[in-house]
C-alpha cells in the first residue's frame, strides 16, 4: 500500500478513487491533483512508480488534509460555541444549525428517541 499524507491508500483502486481515502480529498480535488501532477487517473495505485508518488505527495502537501483539517473544523465549531452565537448554541445543544425542522425528523443530530416519562402520583 502506498502511504500518502499518513494514510495507506488502497492498492487495487484507480488513483483518483484511492486518493479519496485521504480525509479532505474528494473526487473533484483528486481529479485536479492527478491532472496537476500528470498522473493518469485510470492507473492503479500499485502501478505508480516512486516519482509519481512523490509528485502526488508534494501536490497534496499544498492542501489542508487529515488531522490538520479535523483540528481546524473542530476549532471553528469551538469558536462558534465560545461566541455564543445562534449556530454555536445549536452545536452546544446538539441540534441542527442550518434551519432544518426539529419537531419531527433531525433524529441523526438529536440521537435516539427518549421514552416519554409517565406521570407518577
Swiss-Prot record:
Q: Name one GO biological process term.
A: translation
Instruction: Name the segments for region: Disordered.
Output: 92-121
Q: Which InterPro entries match?
A: Rbsml_uS13_C (IPR027437), Ribosomal_uS13 (IPR001892), Ribosomal_uS13-like_H2TH (IPR010979), Ribosomal_uS13_bac-type (IPR019980), Ribosomal_uS13_CS (IPR018269)
The GO terms this record gives for MF are:
rRNA binding; structural constituent of ribosome; tRNA binding
For this protein, the record's SUPFAM superfamilies field holds: S13-like H2TH domain
GO cellular component terms, A-Z:
cytosol; small ribosomal subunit
Highest taxon above the source species:
Bacteria
Keywords of the record, alphabetical order, are: Ribonucleoprotein, Ribosomal protein, RNA-binding, rRNA-binding, tRNA-binding
Report if keyword Magnesium is assigned: no
Q: Where are the transmembrane segments?
A: none
UniProt function note: Located at the top of the head of the 30S subunit, it contacts several helices of the 16S rRNA. In the 70S ribosome it contacts the 23S rRNA (bridge B1a) and protein L5 of the 50S subunit (bridge B1b), connecting the 2 subunits; these bridges are implicated in subunit movement. Contacts the tRNAs in the A and P-sites.
Describe the subunit structure.
Answer: Part of the 30S ribosomal subunit. Forms a loose heterodimer with protein S19. Forms two bridges to the 50S subunit in the 70S ribosome.
Q: Which HAMAP family match?
A: Ribosomal_uS13
Q: Which PANTHER family match?
A: 30S RIBOSOMAL PROTEIN S13/40S RIBOSOMAL PROTEIN S18, SMALL RIBOSOMAL SUBUNIT PROTEIN US13M
Family to which the UniProt record says this protein belongs:
Belongs to the universal ribosomal protein uS13 family.
Protein name (record): Small ribosomal subunit protein uS13
Q: Which organism is it from?
A: Herminiimonas arsenicoxydans
Amino acid at each position: 500500500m502506498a502511504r500518502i499524507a499518513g494514510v495507506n491508500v488502497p492498492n487495487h483502486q484507480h488513483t483518483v478513487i484511492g486518493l479519496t481515502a485521504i480525509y479532505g480529498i474528494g473526487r473533484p480535488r483528486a481529479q485536479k491533483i492527478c491532472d496537476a501532477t500528470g498522473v493518469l487517473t485510470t492507473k492503479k495505485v500499485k502501478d505508480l512508480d516512486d516519482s509519481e508518488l512523490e509528485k502526488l505527495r508534494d501536490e497534496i502537501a499544498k492542501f489542508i488534509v487529515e488531522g490538520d483539517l479535523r483540528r481546524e473544523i473542530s476549532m471553528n465549531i469551538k469558536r462558534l460555541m465560545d461566541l455564543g452565537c445562534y449556530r454555536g448554541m445549536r452545536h452546544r445543544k446538539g441540534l441542527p444549525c442550518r434551519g432544518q425542522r426539529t419537531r419531527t425528523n433531525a433524529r441523526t443530530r438529536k440521537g435516539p428517541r427518549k421514552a416519554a416519562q409517565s406521570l407518577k402520583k
